[in-house]
UniProtKB/Swiss-Prot annotation:
Lineage: Eukaryota, Metazoa, Chordata, Craniata, Vertebrata
Record's subcellular location: Golgi apparatus membrane; Cytoplasm, Cytoskeleton, Spindle; Cytoplasm, Cytoskeleton, Microtubule organizing center, Centrosome; Midbody
Xref: SUPFAM superfamilies: Immunoglobulin
Topology in the lipid bilayer: Single-pass type I membrane protein
Transmembrane feature ranges: 353-373
GO biological process: cell division; centrosome cycle
Organism: Mus musculus
GO CC term, one of those recorded: spindle
Cytoplasmic-side positions: 374-463
Function: Required during prometaphase for centrosome maturation. Following poly-ADP-ribosylation (PARsylation) by TNKS, translocates from the Golgi apparatus to mitotic centrosomes and plays a key role in the formation of robust microtubules for prompt movement of chromosomes: anchors AKAP9/CG-NAP, a scaffold protein of the gamma-tubulin ring complex and promotes centrosome maturation.
Encoding gene per record: Hepacam2
Alphabetic keyword roster: ADP-ribosylation, Cell cycle, Cell division, Cytoplasm, Cytoskeleton, Disulfide bond, Glycoprotein, Golgi apparatus, Immunoglobulin domain, Membrane, Mitosis, Repeat, Signal, Transmembrane, Transmembrane helix
Record's comment on post-translational modification: Poly-ADP-ribosylated (PARsylated) by tankyrase TNKS during late G2 and prophase, leading to translocation to mitotic centrosomes.
Name listed for the protein in its UniProt record: HEPACAM family member 2
Amino acid sequence: MGQDAFMELLRSMVGLSLCKIHLLLIAGSCLGLKVTVPSYTVHGIRGQALYLPVHYGFHTPASDIQIIWLFERSHTMPKYLLGSVNKSVVPDLEYQHKFTMMPPNASLLINPLQFTDEGNYIVKVNIQGNGTLSASQKIQVTVDDPVMKPMVQFHPASGAVEYVGNITLTCQVEGGTRLVYQWRKSGKPISINSSHSFSPQNNTLWIVPVTKEDIGNYTCLVSNPVSEMESDIIMPTIYYGPYGLQVNSDKGLKVGEVFTVDLGEAVLFDCSADSYPPNTYSWIQRSDNTTHVIKHGPHLEVASEKVAQKTADYVCCAYNNITGRRDETRFTVIITSVGLEKLAQRGKSLSPLASITGISLFLIISMCLLFLWKKYQPYKAIRQKLEGRPESEYRKAQTFSGHEDALSDFGIYEFVTFPDASGVSRMSSRSSPASDGVTGQDIHGTIYEVIQHIPEQQQENTE
């Protein structure tokens, strides 16, 4: 009985001490001692070790340093885990293999971490010196399992028709806690709108009804405080179309819905439209208020020389056998001889570069011809100089240019003829005593020809 009473007294004293410590924690840290932690919330993975770093500092002399760790859950009293005075550690025997501390470092190591270890961890530091200083901090610890890779399934698996069917996408995860789901399309988050809605946990996406704009790559991103994983890309099957039906050709000129084709050309027409699955195409020719199908498939070849009329009307029809929708476009083919006209237009339409090149060549050739003309016809300059002389100077020049001594007249001369009357009279007066064999035609020749005859005349006179 006495032993039971002693144990009861010991329990009451320990409980009283824990209550006092808890009250001190609520009061906060004391002046001169500061305890800090990097984060007030730490997320841990079940089965792995978790380290709770703690730092403290003080500016007064200390004889003893005491560190105490407590653990509490919601609506429960704090539980003693371990403590130390200086470098001596006193653990709770129940947790001596789970919690580790190496004083004077106040950090705590939890290994291994279990779901039962989730809660608040309180660290209290006491400094004994001239007085006692105390400070504490609280750290919240959460424990989770990592997320496993999710898988996405969609229904119906065969696909849905645009504006008619609906699609449901479901994200499934086999492992993980506190899961958060997010749906993405082509890498961007999907938000709620008139056709998109989610389940309460966001693990299901409904698209009602589906449209062509809903085509894309869908993924499910699942995360929790310790990890995140994204599913493989899935692309639901959506049937739509046809949209944007149009006809093009490899030759000819297209203006609106009219194709102009040169006579003798074989033109290949192509009919295309956006749809899934691909459309089936048919070509219809209209003539004399009647229509008849001439070909099936996306291509139609028209030989212009085989067309009886110069104008022909055609229709291209596109049909989607899944959506049940169809579309058609009409066009006209005009056959004309435009080959010569094209050549004439090409000849008339010179490019600016060709025009500049032609003008440049013309200027260069003109400058070269002008240079040659000035270089090899200098008589004009001499003529202008002689015509500007007075008559007396000219006669004086004639007087002293006789042939008294023909041998001294040999040399290199440059003469100019004068076709006017004054020039003829001057030349005739100068050349008359030369020789009887010189005719009137020689008088109108150059002075170089007269000089050529003078030596022969003088030689005859000497004989």
